């Protein structure tokens, strides 16, 4: 009996017809051999997930081929490169056992059970063997094995970790597992997708080695994790490796120490200490945000840090978030440090009565928050246990929702523009599996966000399943100078807390109505933002944020009186200025000021003191001589007052 024709639909709605159910690779080959050679995977029926080229397609399947030119194709390359790395290591050291090797951001890793410790000294040997495997252009093919065959095979190879994984799949009802072969002898348990042959790997590099535990549990076997990366061409790899080296120089922990801004102590894990200089940066950000809050109708509130746990039972945090909270018992009552401000703002809202005319109510709060992070997960300022957010909650009517979203996005744009952070993307994160609230509420909340963005002509991407447990959200993903994404701002629609706390307002009809609640932040955690921003700017913060904005450098003690006059005048204009009167050479003082990233250096010698002029040197190395005191004062104070990203002289020099 002949099979009826199978129609495959391409992205432009053209079709390919087959007399059998084709694979995705066959679809690529039907278009052209060159395309087939460059194809690494396929997206089916509008899914964002990449499927293997060996996937057999049903009639009317919509297929979008993923080629080497597609940005996401590198995920398939890295997945296959992880197998090649594991194969190379087992070729060199057969006694090493394999566990798992997933793709991660910017690369991949593989965890190994090894009788000896891997070091970076082993990398050259491993990379050489990987290159041999790539040069052989071994075909990669998939076989689906019955569960029992897979268990027996891996048991015979003494691969106990693979056996455990397969047995877990059997408990979940799986009857077969995918096995991928590199050539004919080496194979691994895997779902895919994978490239067609090892020769499609064009550029890779082993990066580092670290300890790990099987399945992330310290009670399990200790493993060794080898990190690596791969790209579709060598140029992309070289750029990435350059950025890695640059990231080491820009590491905020290194910069924070060099600039004397913050430090950590083991007696307060995950809790940064901000020095006077660091606190200046911190407070500068808060002051700027407070000014914007006043301008845009927010009221800043102060709420307690510790609450009876019943508050978090009401809010749902106890049921959904308690593993990330700190608890204590006082006078036989259970208390918890607040991990978020939203429940306390609901209490504050309920302390008053509102009519429809009073809404929106906008509460901003710089209160300290505490969230538990595992010791191994903490990282400088970007993963801490105590922090402050530029947190605010908006209580509004449903008919005000789109307007409030627009106002928030306008405010966010102003802040990001002021900070030189124009490169960002918006993601709409939808309902997760672990959530509270009815499906009707989720439909309403997700729809409101999407429609508001569309009405503002703001492009966005869907991030399915990544919403908060209480509602969908917009995640603002900032891309820094090294092309790394950071989730900073957020806007979350919450229909659940107003219901949980029975929040009400009196409508125009004199009946009680439920307000809509928006959770919003622009920078997110200030601690985390400062870490990210230090790395983005390489420590060259805008002049208005810098702890020391001006350094006065004397050439000789004879001009000290004039220097002190300048210092006092600048202080009178609220400029943070230091006078370096040390008996050191001028070049040494300049170098010291540059290392501290000080935006303005005023240099005074005999000639300047006599003519009451100065030489102004900027941290970019440019120098402007013969400026009058008034000119320098106006320049510096204007730059700081307007919160300029850099000196106006630096801008004009760049423009010209």
UniProtKB/Swiss-Prot annotation:
It is found in: Cytoplasm. Residues 251-542 are annotated as: Catalytic. One of its GO terms (biological process) is threonyl-tRNA aminoacylation. InterPro entries: aa-tRNA-synt_IIb (IPR002314), aa-tRNA-synth_II (IPR006195), aa-tRNA-synth_II/BPL/LPL (IPR045864), Anticodon-bd (IPR004154), Anticodon-bd_dom_sf (IPR036621), Beta-grasp_dom_sf (IPR012675), TGS (IPR004095), TGS-like (IPR012676). The keyword Aminoacyl-tRNA synthetase applies. Zn(2+) binds at residues 342, 393, 519. Its main location: cytoplasm. SUPFAM superfamilies: Class II aaRS ABD-related, Class II aaRS and biotin synthetases, TGS-like, ThrRS/AlaRS common domain. Residues 2-67 form the TGS domain. Pfam families: HGTP_anticodon (PF03129), TGS (PF02824), tRNA-synt_2b (PF00587), tRNA_SAD (PF07973). Keywords: Aminoacyl-tRNA synthetase, ATP-binding, Cytoplasm, Ligase, Metal-binding, Nucleotide-binding, Protein biosynthesis, RNA-binding, tRNA-binding, Zinc. Its EC number is 6.1.1.3. Its cofactor is Zn(2+). Gene3D superfamilies: 3.10.20.30, 3.30.54.20, Anticodon-binding domain, Bira Bifunctional Protein, Domain 2, Threonyl-trna Synthetase, Chain A, domain 2. Homodimer. Belongs to the class-II aminoacyl-tRNA synthetase family. Catalyzes the attachment of threonine to tRNA(Thr) in a two-step reaction: L-threonine is first activated by ATP to form Thr-AMP and then transferred to the acceptor end of tRNA(Thr). Also edits incorrectly charged L-seryl-tRNA(Thr). This is Threonine--tRNA ligase. It comes from Bdellovibrio bacteriovorus (strain ATCC 15356 / DSM 50701 / NCIMB 9529 / HD100). The lineage of its organism: Bacteria, Pseudomonadati, Bdellovibrionota, Bdellovibrionia, Bdellovibrionales. The gene is thrS.
């Amino acid at each position: 009996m002949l099979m009826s024709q199978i129609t495959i639909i391409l992205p432009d709605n053209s079709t390919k017809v087959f007399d059998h159910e084709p694979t995705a690779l066959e679809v690529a080959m039907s278009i052209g051999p060159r395309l087939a050679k460059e194809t690494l995977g396929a997206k089916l029926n509008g899914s964002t997930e990449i499927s293997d080229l060996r996937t057999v397609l049903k009639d009317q399947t919509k297929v979008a081929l993923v080629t080497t030119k597609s940005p996401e194709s590198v995920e398939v390359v890295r997945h296959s490169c992880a197998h090649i790395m594991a194969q190379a290591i087992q070729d060199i050291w057969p006694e090493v056992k394999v566990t798992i090797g997933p793709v991660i951001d910017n690369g991949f890793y593989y965890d190994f059970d090894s009788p000896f410790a891997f070091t970076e000294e082993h990398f050259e040997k491993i990379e050489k063997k990987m290159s041999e495997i790539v040069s052989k252009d071994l075909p990669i093919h998939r076989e689906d094995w019955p569960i029992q065959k897979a268990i027996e095979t891996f048991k015979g190879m003494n691969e106990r970790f693979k056996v455990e994984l397969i047995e877990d799949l059997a408990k979940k009802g799986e009857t077969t597992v995918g096995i991928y072969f590199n050539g004919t002898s080496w194979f691994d348990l895997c779902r895919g997708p994978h490239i067609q042959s090892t020769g499609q790997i064009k550029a890779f590099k082993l990066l580092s080695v670290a300890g790990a535990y099987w399945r992330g549990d310290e009670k399990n076997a200790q493993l060794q994790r080898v990190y690596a990366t791969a790209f579709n061409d060598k140029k992309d790899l070289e750029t990435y490796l350059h950025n890695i080296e640059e990231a080491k120089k820009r590491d905020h922990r290194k910069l924070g120490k060099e600039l004397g801004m913050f430090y950590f102590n083991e007696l307060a894990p995950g809790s940064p200490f901000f020095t006077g200089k660091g606190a200046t940066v911190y407070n500068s950000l808060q002051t700027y945000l407070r000014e914007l809050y006043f301008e845009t109708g927010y009221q800043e509130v102060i709420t307690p840090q510790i609450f009876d746990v019943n508050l978090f039972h009401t809010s749902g945090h106890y049921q959904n978030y308690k593993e990330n909270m700190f608890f204590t018992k006082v006078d036989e009552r259970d208390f918890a440090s607040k991990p978020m401000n939203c429940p306390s703002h609901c209490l504050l809202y309920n302390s008053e009565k509102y009519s429809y005319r009073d809404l929106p109510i906008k509460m901003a709060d710089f209160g300290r928050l505490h969230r538990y992070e595992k010791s191994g997960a903490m990282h400088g300022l970007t993963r801490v246990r105590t922090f402050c957010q530029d947190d605010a909650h908006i209580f509004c009517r449903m008919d005000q929702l789109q307007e409030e979203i627009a106002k928030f996005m306008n405010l966010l744009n102003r802040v990001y523009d002021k900070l030189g952070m124009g490169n960002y993307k918006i993601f709409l994160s939808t309902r997760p599996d672990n959530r509270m609230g009815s499906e009707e509420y989720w439909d309403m909340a997700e729809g409101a966000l999407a429609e508001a963005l569309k009405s503002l002509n703001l492009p966005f991407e869907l991030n399915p399943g990544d919403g908060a447990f209480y509602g969908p959200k917009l995640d603002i993903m900032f891309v820094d100078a090294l092309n790394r994404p950071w989730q900073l701002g957020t806007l979350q629609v919450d229909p659940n807390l107003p219901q949980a706390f029975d929040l009400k307002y009196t409508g125009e009809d004199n009946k009680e109505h439920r307000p809509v609640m928006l959770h919003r932040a622009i920078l997110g955690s200030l601690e985390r933002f400062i870490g990210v921003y230090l790395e983005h700017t390489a420590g060259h913060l805008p002049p208005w944020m810098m702890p020391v904005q001006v350094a006065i450098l004397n050439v000789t003690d004879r001009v000290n009186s004039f220097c002190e006059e300048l210092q006092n005048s600048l202080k009178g204009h609220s400029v943070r200025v230091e006078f370096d009167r040390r008996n050191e050479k001028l070049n040494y003082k300049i170098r010291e000021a540059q290392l501290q990233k000080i935006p303005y250096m005023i240099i005074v010698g005999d000639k300047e003191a006599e003519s009451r002029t100065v030489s102004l040197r900027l941290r970019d190395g440019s120098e402007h001589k013969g400026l009058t005191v008034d000119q320098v004062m106006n320049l510096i104070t204007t730059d700081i007052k307007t919160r300029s990203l850099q000196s106006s002289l630096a801008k004009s020099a760049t423009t010209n």
